[in-house]
Design a protein with these regions (language model features):
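Glycine-rich adenosine-cofactor-binding loop
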Residues: 1-15, 26
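Short, glycine/serine-rich, charged loops/turns that create anion-binding
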Residues: 5, 29, 106
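Conserved S-adenosyl-L-methionine
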Residues: 15-21, 119-124
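NAD(P)-binding Rossmann-fold cofactor-contacting core
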Residues: 17-47
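Short, charged, surface-exposed secondary-structure boundary motifs
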Residues: 32-36, 83-84, 135-138
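Rossmann-like adenosine-cofactor binding region
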Residues: 49-125
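Adenosine-phosphate binding glycine-rich loop
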Residues: 100, 104-160
Length: 160
């Protein structure tokens, strides 16, 4: 879910890692055209991948496609402080035990989406702290030319 920078990176990486189908859901806003462009680019550059774009407002289609999927990623601001009680998934019955749910949101550490995925028994439900940490590592390397002490940074700032 989403079509901004983080979402686009996740969608492209999913295609490069072997995803056969990618469903992009985004609000009919200024980023919707980005989603359509991303879909075309992925299909043109990565053989064997089908990318479909739908309006996030179509919850029936969203739930239908979630049921066909193995992974759900939220790369929108939904659930981010100060709206931590928000989730784009209203019907949590779509979460199954073998399902993977990830959220790019890192504040709060555990979004409503992740809490509900865990409560539903999803195999993996993880928040955005890892993404934040590794983006920081990449930026550190770009600006300093050195590797960031990632484990130390994680222990000091993100553990617990």
């Amino acid at each position: 879910m989403g079509a901004g920078g983080a979402a686009t990176a996740i969608q492209v990486q999913a295609a490069l890692e072997g995803a056969k189908k990618i469903y992009i859901f985004n609000c009919k806003d200024k980023f919707y055209a980005n989603a359509e462009n991303t879909a075309r680019k992925i299909e043109n550059k990565v053989p064997g991948v089908t990318v479909e774009v739908y309006p996030l407002e179509d919850s029936q289609k969203l739930y239908e496609k979630i049921k066909e999927s193995d992974i759900l990623v939220n790369a929108t601001k939904s659930g981010m402080k100060p709206a931590e009680d928000e989730s784009l998934i209203k019907d949590v019955s779509v979460f199954q035990p073998d399902f993977v749910v990830a959220d790019a949101v890192y504040n709060p550490r555990e979004t409503k989406l992740i809490r509900e995925a865990k409560a539903a028994g999803c195999k993996i439900a993880l928040g955005g702290i890892g993404m934040l940490l590794w983006q920081g590592e990449a930026a550190f390397r770009i600006f300093t030319g050195e590797s960031m002490p990632t484990e130390e940074v994680y222990e000091r700032f993100f553990r617990g």
